[in-house]
Amino acid sequence: MIRFALTIGSVVALLATGTAGAADSNKVLHWEFRAAETGFDPGRVTDYYSNTVIEAVFERLLTYDYLARPSKLVPEAAEGMPQIGDNGKTYLFRIRKGAYFAPDPAFKGAKRELTAEDVAYSIKRHMDPKNRSYWQWLVDGKIVGLDELAQKAKVGVTGLDYDARIPGLEVVDRYTIRIRLTRTDYNFTYILAMPAMSIVAREVIDAYGEDSNAHPVGTGPYMLTRWARASKISLEANPSYHGFVWSFQPGIEPGDNEIVARMKGRKMPVIGRIEISVIEEEQSRWLAFQRGELDILLLPGTFAPVAMPGNKLSPELARRGVTINQLIDPEITYTFFNMRDPVLGGFAKEKIALRRAIAMAYDTAEEVRVVRKDQAVEVQSPIPQGIAGFEPSNKSGIAFDPAAANALLDKFGYRRGADGFRTLPDGAPLVIKRWSRSGDSEARELDDLWSKSLKRIGLRMETVTTKFADLLKMSRQCQPMMASAAWIADYPDADNFMQLLSSANIGQSNYACYSSPEFDRLYSAARQLPDSAERNAIYREMNRRLEADTVWKLGVSRVRTMLIQPTVKAYKKHPILHAEWAFIDMERER
């Protein structure tokens, strides 16, 4: 929730040092991705893995305090927190001087400083029709004059006029920008801290055009030096980075005081290189960590009983000096039903009954126990714990009940044939096609569990496997009949999850392609309110609408257990940030 009393004089947590010379090239952190990245242009990608790299390469106006829980915003490219006026509709930011982009041929040998113009340009890109930004929903309808500018680009032939001045993005001077909103947005400061709002240089985008995903050039602590798609990513400390002094205060969680004692006053970053390997198979990731080829590992669920018997670190790992850091991710997994699919979609009673039966046939508790190895908790609404708007008393109205699911299908004419499988009410064959990502043993386990679940109510299921990046693309295009997805918080507010069902976000984040005037009306009403009991009441009504239409089958929030080699120091998983690399230390590589 926005606090309107914030001023430019707010405390700056990331104190600039004027140099990034502290980075040691002999300190190399080995990291893993469980799925392939898609690229590194902040305006063109949405996946977790790409955004992890984007977070390290670019800066945003705001970021998060490394240790504060609940998550707390602090300045990054901004000099301080914004001056907020006009009842939360005007934001005045002063840009930190001396923040330079990493060297790149696009700058023709000149040092290039980040300015207020870059902030305005980066925001405008999300509304450029040519970019087809999946993050358009962050600014669509929010910034005074921006929609009108985008509309001119849609009907014109020259594209978006980035040089045009609009009231909502007023560049006051080289280091000052005033952002004017069309209405109060209680989450706008959170939005400005998202990887999608990373600040890019126009010269770089112009130079590389459609290949901008391969050429991320930012003012952040690291820069891309090697990219073997879907295999290896190498980052090195950005020689142009201004650096900062580690000055975070301990929170209330165990280990914070030890982290502060080790890191306070250090010039950051100190790790000189990040080596990222894309390793899709769980066993391969586990063995790589066991061999010391990975420094930090997100514990694969399959190996949770081995690494953490009884939910305690195994004696073998403890003897080696391995430590753990755990949190329940502020996320949801869910299975969406394509509301445009001719078999499964639509609002006819028999279609809703089919979706409801499928949802009731799936045992999420079995998923937690068998697939997740108890490294997850069931979610009861689209708003996970740790997020403003979460209510522990909320319980899903769609429970595991295969008997009721069978009765529902019988009632609406989905009859069983001689082979035991059901047909459509008109007698035509009925096949449920569930799309899934390839190359992942966990995904295969989920495929098997879904197949078993549907078989128990007489539904034949076929699995369509595809690469993770292609599955995302197809989902935005409303192609899968049904598929599973996950959404981890971009910012710690329920709005970030409820937007997944807004009809305005079809083609972006609304993979179910759900369009409900009633849901949209409620969503619009909720966005006018701060975090409050009144807003929570609207969210409960939205959840009832979602369940009545049965657009999703809710899944879990995963327990993120990070295994940490003894060479890594001061690591703590952040609930919102993806890449904590600039905040930690490690022993030198021998």
Question: What residue spans do the PLM features occupy?
Answer:
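Active-site-proximal polar cores
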Residues: 555
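Sec/Tat signal peptide C-region and signal peptidase I cleavage site
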Residues: 18-22
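Non-catalytic accessory/assembly modules
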Residues: 135-157, 162-192
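N-terminal lobe/hinge region of extracytoplasmic solute-binding protein
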Residues: 32-86, 217
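N-terminal secretory signal peptides that target proteins for export/translocation
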Residues: 1-2
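Residue-level recognition of beta-strand termini and adjacent short loop/turns
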Residues: 85-87, 173, 229
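Bacterial N-terminal signal peptides
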Residues: 5-16
